[in-house]
């Protein structure tokens, strides 16, 4: 059984599949009452459950086994990034972030941003799809657009880094970061941060890396 379904409506001994998930299971995969599937909740929970009915609009499943904190990481990574103009590149970034286990993603709005707004629902759907396809149990927290200045000032992670291209020899991230910690990584083109003054970033304990 190598396919996951997603639901956040998890109760003591049963769960409810969202209509789109239930429709795929019942109409496409031809699941029947009594058939078993695996459901994840996006927060480390994994549930083996049996269909109790075949109603896509109100699909109940009986939980027969459950596990918590499956694949829980020993670190926390928060990525701040100015979203690319291309939908394909943005969706690729979301997919890879889920696959490698990024815990939080914030989209940064700057004077040079190629995209001034994002569709959170579409992005979340892509993240859920990637989680199921890669057999993961955690979804990253995905935040709406925020200004670069507000993001940097309000960032509360223990270790903070900025990917920055320059002629100076900046430290490599693997040599800069300590193990098993709480990280914030700000990623974008160099021009994005010119108006923020790099010396101010250093005063806010953001370290440059390449």
Regions from the language model: what does each represent?
Residues 181, 190-210:
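Structured adenosyl-cofactor binding patch, chiefly the S-adenosyl-L-methionine
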Residues 1-68, 121:
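N-terminal positively charged helical leader segments and presequences
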Residues 84, 188-190:
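Short, surface-exposed acidic/glycine-rich loop or hinge patches that mediate macromolecular interfaces
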Residues 25, 89-93, 197:
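Hydrophobic side chains in well-ordered alpha-helices
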Residues 108, 163, 207-209:
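Conserved residues at the C-terminal ends of beta-strands
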Residues 70-161:
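RNA substrate-binding interface of SAM-dependent RNA methyltransferases
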Residues 37, 62, 70-83, 177-181:
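Mobile, glycine- and charge-enriched loop segments
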């Amino acid at each position: 059984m190598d396919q996951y379904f997603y639901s956040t409506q998890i109760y003591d001994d049963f769960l409810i599949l969202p209509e789109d998930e239930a429709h795929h299971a019942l109409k496409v995969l031809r699941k029947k009452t009594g058939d078993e599937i695996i459901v994840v909740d996006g927060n480390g929970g994994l549930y083996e459950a049996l269909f109790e009915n075949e109603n896509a609009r109100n699909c109940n499943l009986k939980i027969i086994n459950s596990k918590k904190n499956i694949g829980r990481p020993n670190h926390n990574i928060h990525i701040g990034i100015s979203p690319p103009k291309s939908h394909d590149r943005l969706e690729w970034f979301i997919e890879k972030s889920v696959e490698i286990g990024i815990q939080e993603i914030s989209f940064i709005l700057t004077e040079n941003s190629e995209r001034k707004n994002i569709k959170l629902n579409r992005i979340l759907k892509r993240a859920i799809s990637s989680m199921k396809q890669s057999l993961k149990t955690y979804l990253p927290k995905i935040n709406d657009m925020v200004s670069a200045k507000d993001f940097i000032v309000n960032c509360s992670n223990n270790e903070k880094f900025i990917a920055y291209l320059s002629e100076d020899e900046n430290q490599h991230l693997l040599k800069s970061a300590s193990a098993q910690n709480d990280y914030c990584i700000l990623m974008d083109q160099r021009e994005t941060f010119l108006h923020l003054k790099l010396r101010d970033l250093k005063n806010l304990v953001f370290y440059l890396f390449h």
